[in-house]
């Protein structure tokens, strides 16, 4: 029989294969020159199919291109001249066009073990990219599996212009295949990296090679691993432009072929992929080629039941009619839907979702047939190979995406660029977890879980990883530093065991609180090590706060209690309130399981603490503004003001920390930066607060310091200046020195600080003592009494020559009275309203007033003469410088009866003039004074002169008493108009 045109077509097609780039480069993953690309093919025996036509077997040996063409005489073929000699060039890679393979030869499933590697075009690396040098050496080193002849299935994808190769080696017992490997097949075998288990001869009855033209998404489920039951679905996802029909074959249908994507990583064993099964011939109906004009087009129907082959066995297993591909004009406008093929009688398996891949909506997500699916699974081939570890998908710039890409993940450093490997674990009888959809992935940032759900728990390890060395520094630093206020309080107790009780109580409270806080931080800080338990940790955490607060109240009551109302000054009231405070906190922490009750108790505790702190600040302000600013109070108001401010801040932070202390039932406390900030500053405030209270307790319990240091006083005056209108030093007499008794200014007693004159046993001034005698010698007569002769009295200086400057400090008024007028002229003092000595009832205006220049008009009363007796020695020595005034010589009527008969009885108390500052003109002596300022002297004892009878008789009575005291020739000065001091 003459050779048919179909044989010529097959021969020409096989001759064009080396020119189309189907050589060894297909198994390598990188482009190679098309001129040197060849692929050997080995024929085999094939049984007849059930469709009515024999399977097409192509013998592609160059020696006999059409040896078996007579077997295909009953099949229509296209003439050779109508077949395209060379496909249309495409930037994505070459494409093959040819007749469809017979379906009858593929009824039995064949395990496919080679990994698909898509051939790359000369201008694009596509999905895989070039191989590394290390990968190239490893692939060259792998020896081919010594099993039968390779079966190459060429699966050209028309839109991508790429050729996908699947190597199907038969088993060792295959008897229908004969022949030897050609020499050029050794290169292909060296590049084949797949190994398959032995299969029976009945498992391999397909053609040695099959040319299938398809379009659309290409998927294949494979089994990988070494000994597990995981199924790895590797998918080469096509974009929307992948569904474009080739102009040379506009009516080509969509056939889901089988592919394996394989990537060899250096240092790792190659992935072993085993195909589940190849669809039998009944499932892939083929229409006969139709002749349309001068072109030959091969149409392949969709997996749905065609009208001519409605009696296929797997048609009834399909859930419904499968849609066919859209026409070529509509294909580029919308993406193609993934096809569902019934494989080995099982329920169709949808492709595994790949991040960033194109998938039409409505694709079923289930990868495992449900229990109600009727499809049988008789020839399912599952090799017991372990599952490999899943690799992360790697993003690339040119990847087609229909939804926002997933966050980039780190891929292995040796993985190929552009490769997608999807691994799913298949558990028998359990559906996999639902995959996230595009909408959920897009809304993930907006609906992200709160920070508490993902934050690390409050445990030592996570806190140390998050905070690094700050965590240990905080824990151990605070635990050790709290020992310092404890030591200060212990020192206060040891130094003054007999001090004030409130100060000792405050020291004990500070000692206990500091010890508890230090123990809590060093044993189980914030419950991170779970050593104390929940209840024990709460007790140690909350108890120091009421202790420090009670210590502050005790010190305030001790130092500033005077400003409180009397009912609040009772220490027993403070003790009762402190006891209720501490016991309430302990009871709620140990017994309550309701977090709301614990928070309420903490709120009341912090409110009481804030009230005590504010009261302390108010009392300190009142004391600093009203009272003196010395360190006489213990403890001082300034130190208590600092402690009150720290207590107020600590009360607020204690309430904020309670929000994390009681997270609620079933909730675990988790780390947050707000938690860290609150607890960090709260520990620092507690430490400073305890130090201030310990210092205040030491200041209250220690002995009182003698004086204030001058340098420290200056610093305090600079730091706290006195308010305007207030004097730093109170106004006190210059000779009054307040002792340490701190008496008030109104209760000053200056009698103790006065310098008293010596007793009246002082001697008279003698010439040997000099003219500048002491002021104490004035007014002190001799002890001999009136019988003292005049010879014993020496000359004395005048009042202007006397040294009346007293030693300092001295009360000047009392010194003047004691020096001039003691028991002489006035009763008590010249500066006070008093009568003369000896008067039973002094007249109302009889008091001597110290006014200057007073005119001598006052009359001498009855007792006036008795004042000037011989006992006055200081005034009797005054020299007479002028005539005696008339008012002194003439005594008025009514006064003579009470006179003592002395010439001194005529002395007038109104004639005394006192000049307080005799040297105010800057003059050096008395003689240089102005005339009006010169002191006028009086002759107290004038010489006897003839006078009227009454006067003479009166003077005679008086001279009888005075004459024995001295000679008549001696003049004595009784007084002067002006006494200069």
Curated annotation (Swiss-Prot):
The chain crosses the membrane at residues 475-495, 502-522, 543-563, 571-591, 599-619, 639-659, 680-700. It is found in: Membrane. It is a multi-pass membrane protein. Residues 496-501, 564-570, 620-638, 701-981 are cytoplasmic. Keywords: Glycoprotein, Membrane, Methylation, Phosphoprotein, Signal, Transmembrane, Transmembrane helix. One of its GO terms (cellular component) is membrane. Residues 297-302 are annotated as: O-glycosylated at one site. The keyword Transit peptide does not apply. Residues 1-27 form the signal peptide. Glycans are attached at residues 329, 363, 379. Residues 28-474, 523-542, 592-598, 660-679 are extracellular. Residues 411-427, 972-981 have a biased composition (Polar residues). Residues 65-85, 331-340 have a biased composition (Basic and acidic residues). InterPro entries: PRRT3. Residues 437-457, 765-780 have a biased composition (Low complexity). The modification Phosphoserine is found at residues 777, 789, 798, 808, 815, 854, 874, 902-903, 911. This is Proline-rich transmembrane protein 3. It comes from Homo sapiens.
